[in-house]
Amino acid sequence: MNIKKLSLCIFFATTQVHAFTQWGAGGITPMGHEWLTRTSALEVLNAEHKTSVDPNDPRNTWTSGLAKNIDISTADDEVAKIKSHTNDNSLYAPRSDAVYSAIVGQRWVDLGGMNVANNLISQTGPDCFDAVSQEPADIQQDHFMRRYDDNGQQGGVKSAQRGQERFITHFINAAMATNKRIVVWDGGGSSAKTDVDYNYFLFGRAVHLFQDSFSPEHVVRSPSDNYEKVRQVKAYICTEGAEQHAHSTGAVLDYTSGDVIWKVGTKTDTGWGGYKASNMKPVALVAMEASKDLWAAFMRTMSVDINEREKYARNEAQVLIDKWMSFDKDEMEHWYDNENNRDNTYVKVDGDTGKGKLQKECMSGLSAKNRYGATIKPKTQKELVDVLDDSRRYCLFNIEAEPGYADANDPYLNIPFNWRWKSNSWLVPNASWQQKQLDRDTGKIIKIKEFTNNQELTVDSIENNYSIVTGAKKPLSLVRVPGDGGKSFYLRSKDNPYLFFSYSDKKNGRIKLWHSPNQAEFEILPGNNIFNLKNTYWNQYVWYDKNSKGAYLTEKGSPDNASSKWIISEEN
């Protein structure tokens, strides 16, 4: 079978591997990660609004596996902000924009914005869903899984340690990110652009990794402690000395897969009435309890002053690891010495005569697409990894940021959050080309003042077609986004990422917010702490009219005139 079938089944069962399942098109597979993420948040906030109290909730009788610390009494301001910024998305019913953003963020980890059913430029090319967002060795820690070369029981220790370290990194990055909104692709059975809170979107990365550390397809946990501790870590591409993640789409559809959070037999409980604790598998319910701790920790963290937040975030992340992602190194290094701990997916290391299969036998069930779109059946693990690496390189060469959005990138998948194909046919990289490592965030938040009277540019409403003036109701914060060639910039609204510092028709030339980056690229030309703004399309300068209190882009602008000079400051 394919590593991940791009078939009608995978269209319905959006991401069958590398995660608790995500919602599938048409509701064929219900929410998985999304349910854990939204419900844990709403339980912490006491804000559930779609489901009723479940009288058969197993947690009522539990003594372990429950959240340890959901105290948010020190985070009143952050909680108030979360509750005030509502979101009425009908699919997830998140109630809050922060919750919605985290849901989209955790989905991104699996999907990378890819349309799973149609993620190709053409069929004569690589499978970029696999090659970019699922299979690279260096992103396995985002799913709390082994790399292909994490062999033996020590490989489980190394992968668990890397997963813990990556979790801390994601938690801190989310807490310390610039406060702004960004546009991202939300992939799956279909794909669509959406805008999200940047901090909580990045928090979704930490949420995803954290929740994946509970999936029985990713790790071994035990009911003896109600799944609180990690015993071993599984693999996906026939790693020796490890149990393997299942490759069956059918197991997702009938709920027998460990990645499905719902009990077998509950598929007929459709609609919101089926989303209840008594329908959840025990380990998934523990994952939801742990996610409550995660949400509370992040709310507390976001309430801390930015100058002290990084240290606080690191401490909170470590506490979460100690409570929910810990393992006994000695136990893990000897876990598979007991053959009763090996299931029928276990791949033996060389010289092991006990229970399990050889890597060659495991590899016989795998296939993948190469860069030309041909299905190959590799005989060795290395051959498969080489095919995937080559396809990844080919895919990345064909991806670029949408104009005006090159500031926000995923440095792990190494693609922009708002990306596009460079062409409608595959472009071929030369033999020496390698994708450069993208920076996480190259945008700078700026404010602009007119030079003559030192008045800040403002706007009456952060909406399309509103003129940018002085003395209006709302301050205007802009993200300075690198443009083509690195010498010019787009100026995008910090608070509405679809809007750009642009102009009306050339006859009038009034500067305004506009819902397109087209012809809205500017050079920012310095001189003695003041600047000129030169539009690269018209080669004209932005100037200020004190009578109308507005800014304009016409031939009247001149770099030497005081009216064409601007004071630009960066926000901390």
From Swiss-Prot:
SUPFAM superfamilies recorded: Phospholipase C/P1 nuclease
An annotated Gene Ontology molecular function: hydrolase activity, acting on ester bonds
Keyword annotations of the record: Cytolysis, Hemolysis, Toxin, Virulence
Coiled-coil stretches: none
One of the GO biological process terms: killing of cells of another organism
Signal peptide (from-to): none
Biological role: Bacterial hemolysins are exotoxins that attack blood cell membranes and cause cell rupture by mechanisms not clearly defined.
This protein's name: Hemolysin-1
Encoding gene (name): ash1
